[in-house]
Regions:
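Conserved small/polar residues in nucleotide/adenosyl-binding loops
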Residues: 144-151
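Amphipathic alpha-helical interface segments
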Residues: 1-71, 75-87, 96-98, 116-120, ...
Length: 152
């Protein structure tokens, strides 16, 4: 079987997070160069994934690469979005999550929002996990940048 076709044969996991999990080294190999990180992630992800499974790896590799040179992790998310098709489902879902971050009250609300939007989607699908990551970064920024009760 040619390598370019191997990923689609008897593979129901084409849009799951397997390629996302493998994308970190591409970002580390190209810190501050998200285009290159996304390109390397694409080459790797295409062996086992398609569509949003590939786009997720490209998005995360680019975002991690950008995070090396940016202060705000959500700015890195924005850079990651520039490396995937603007109208793919994953990009639309990430933009949805970004739009919810300003009013997010905590992890329970984040989980409820994702569960509501992605009803019936498997827990290890790329899209719902990307949105949870965006929410985690947003909530983490709030915790990191808000004054600690101990500072009072």
């Amino acid at each position: 079987v040619p390598a370019r076709r191997a990923g689609v044969i008897d593979n129901p996991y084409l849009e799951w997070i397997g390629a996302d999990i493998r994308c970190d080294p591409w970002a580390y190999a190209a810190p501050g160069w998200p285009e290159r990180a996304a390109e390397m992630a694409y080459r790797d992800a295409y062996l086992s994934h398609r569509r949003n499974g590939v786009y997720g790896a490209m998005f995360f590799a680019a975002a991690i690469s950008a995070a090396f040179v940016l202060e705000d992790p959500l700015d890195a998310v924005g850079i990651g979005l520039t490396e995937i098709p603007a109208e793919c489902r994953l990009a639309k879902d990430i933009r949805w999550a970004l739009g919810k971050t300003k009013s997010l009250s905590g992890w329970q609300e984040a989980r409820a929002l994702v569960d509501g939007r992605f009803q019936g989607m498997h827990a290890v699908h790329t899209n719902n996990n990307a949105c949870l990551t965006v929410f985690g970064l947003a909530l983490g920024c709030l915790l990191y940048t808000s004054p600690s009760p101990r500072d009072s």
